[in-house]
């Protein structure tokens, strides 16, 4: 079972072949595989370390105790387990390595680990070990520590909160109408959360979470790599689909996504973090009056996302669709916003469709193409897509599609033209089916950070 997302208490994993049907097999497997750890012993701690990819070293040199060291590239957790002792006698020491290789401590995090063991709160202890291990694995090196990045992000979000609090006067106003209140180590769980919205006496919050940062390549988010296990089903003899091995990874820094299920943090708020990641091609889609001016963050710029082979480019513009900006749109939009984000994240497949919807003759020249997406909010969210070959700016080379996301999440092609001529309803219907299929294909999202060269 997936973690709850922003707009429902429980979000079930859907069947890929039938999105309207809950995948109960997957649900039960997930439930069985998520049985909480509760073994407070030497073997239990060893199991927990191996489960989350930490190295384990055991020191039994002293007769009455065993010292376990759970080690990553940055973190070191020393757990002293006395023989025949209670959980209250177990000691935990947490240390981190800095860029120079020296150790430093985090007394707050260490105390949370100790308290969880002392109170036999094994689920909380496991969550915190998992969080530490994940951030450790996500750090490409000691010099590029996600723990340091998170500290910088926390400072930025706290500065934003204090600036908004001085303007809006009350904490409640910042939570309801501002950009939220950051909370560190909320309810004993390590990490940074943002309380950002209240509705019907419920306070919504999200945890910032990093996942598997790579050791290679330039900093970017990679969307749509090896999405298809086989070529798509041919819908028409006029469509010449590219094979899987022709898919090219597309780097983009449109959004910094920490956890795809929960919250997409507006890029204005993570500018210091992006700077540390050496990601500089940042765009602010609209002039935000609140903290972009307060903190001197950039207002507007144009961003182009280039293919690795440098022969293609993608330009993305539109609104910053974050949970805390939903107050700007009618209430029925939240369900539809996920549909919009799904379309944007599927733009590799969208480009494949557009490259093949013209004719087989042009398939060879598809390596010099550009896709421009824009998002609008009217009665329904609107996606405006414009496709053309690079260096051919005349109207005869353009394909323009206007898609709307209906209240039930279905996509509707409102308008489609090729070479300035509107296509027939039948042609638009075929395209709509192709687009709908892409929403059922899983996404591979990775975060790349530039290597540190000594």
UniProtKB/Swiss-Prot annotation:
Q: What is its main location?
A: nucleus
The transmembrane residues are: none
Pfam families annotated for this entry?
Med1
Which Gene Ontology molecular-function terms are recorded? transcription coactivator activity
Query: What is this protein's record name?
Result: Mediator of RNA polymerase II transcription subunit 1
The compartments listed are: Nucleus
Q: Source species, please? A: Schizosaccharomyces pombe (strain 972 / ATCC 24843)
What protein family is recorded?
Belongs to the Mediator complex subunit 1 family.
Provide the alphabetized UniProt keywords.
Activator, Nucleus, Transcription, Transcription regulation
Q: Any one cellular component term from GO for this entry?
A: mediator complex
- InterPro entries with a match to the protein in the record: Mediator_Med1
Q: What does this protein do?
A: Component of the Mediator complex, a coactivator involved in the regulated transcription of nearly all RNA polymerase II-dependent genes. Mediator functions as a bridge to convey information from gene-specific regulatory proteins to the basal RNA polymerase II transcription machinery. Mediator is recruited to promoters by direct interactions with regulatory proteins and serves as a scaffold for the assembly of a functional preinitiation complex with RNA polymerase II and the general transcription factors.
- Coiled coil start-end: none
Q: How does it assemble?
A: Component of the Mediator complex.
Q: Name one GO biological process term.
A: positive regulation of transcription initiation by RNA polymerase II
């Amino acid at each position: 079972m997936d973690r709850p997302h922003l707009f429902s208490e429980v979000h079930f994993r859907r069947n890929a072949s039938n999105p309207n049907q809950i995948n109960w097999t997957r649900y039960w497997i997930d439930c069985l595989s998520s049985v909480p750890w509760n073994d407070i012993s030497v073997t239990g701690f060893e199991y927990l370390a191996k489960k989350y990819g930490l190295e384990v070293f055991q020191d039994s040199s002293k007769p009455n105790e065993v010292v376990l060291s759970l080690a990553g590239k940055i973190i070191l957790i020393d757990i002293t387990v006395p023989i025949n002792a209670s959980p209250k006698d177990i000691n935990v020491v947490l240390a981190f390595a800095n860029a120079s290789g020296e150790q430093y401590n985090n007394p707050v995090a260490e105390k949370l680990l100790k308290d969880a063991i002392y109170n036999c709160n094994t689920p909380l202890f496991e969550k915190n070990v998992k969080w530490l291990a994940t951030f450790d694995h996500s750090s490409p090196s000691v010099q590029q520590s996600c723990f340091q990045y998170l500290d910088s992000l926390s400072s930025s979000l706290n500065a934003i909160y204090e600036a908004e609090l001085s303007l809006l006067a009350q904490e409640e106003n910042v939570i309801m109408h501002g950009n939220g209140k950051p909370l560190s180590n909320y309810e004993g769980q390590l990490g940074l959360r943002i309380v950002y919205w209240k509705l019907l006496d419920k306070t919504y919050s999200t945890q910032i979470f990093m996942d598997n940062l790579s050791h290679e390549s330039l900093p970017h988010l990679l969307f749509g790599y090896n999405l298809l296990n086989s070529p798509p089903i041919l819908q028409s003899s006029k469509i010449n689909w590219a094979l899987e091995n022709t898919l090219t990874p597309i780097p983009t820094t449109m959004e910094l996504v920490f956890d795809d299920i929960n919250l997409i943090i507006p890029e204005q708020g993570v500018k210091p973090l992006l700077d540390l990641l050496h990601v500089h091609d940042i765009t602010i889609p609209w002039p935000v009056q609140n903290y972009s001016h307060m903190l001197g963050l950039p207002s507007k710029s144009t961003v182009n996302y280039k293919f690795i082979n440098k022969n293609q480019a993608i330009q993305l513009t539109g609104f910053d669709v974050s949970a805390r900006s939903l107050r700007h749109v009618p209430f029925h939009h939240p369900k539809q916003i996920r549909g919009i984000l799904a379309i944007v994240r599927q733009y590799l497949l969208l480009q494949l469709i557009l490259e093949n919807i013209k004719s087989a003759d042009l398939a060879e020249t598809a390596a010099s193409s550009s896709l421009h997406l824009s998002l609008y909010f009217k009665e329904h969210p609107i996606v405006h897509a414009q496709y053309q070959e690079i260096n051919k700016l005349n109207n005869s080379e353009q394909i323009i599609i206007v898609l709307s996301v209906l209240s039930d999440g279905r996509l509707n092609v409102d308008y489609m033209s090729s070479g300035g001529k509107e296509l027939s309803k039948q042609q638009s219907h075929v395209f709509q089916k192709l687009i709908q299929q892409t929403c059922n294909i899983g996404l591979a999202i990775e975060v790349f950070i530039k290597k540190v060269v000594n």
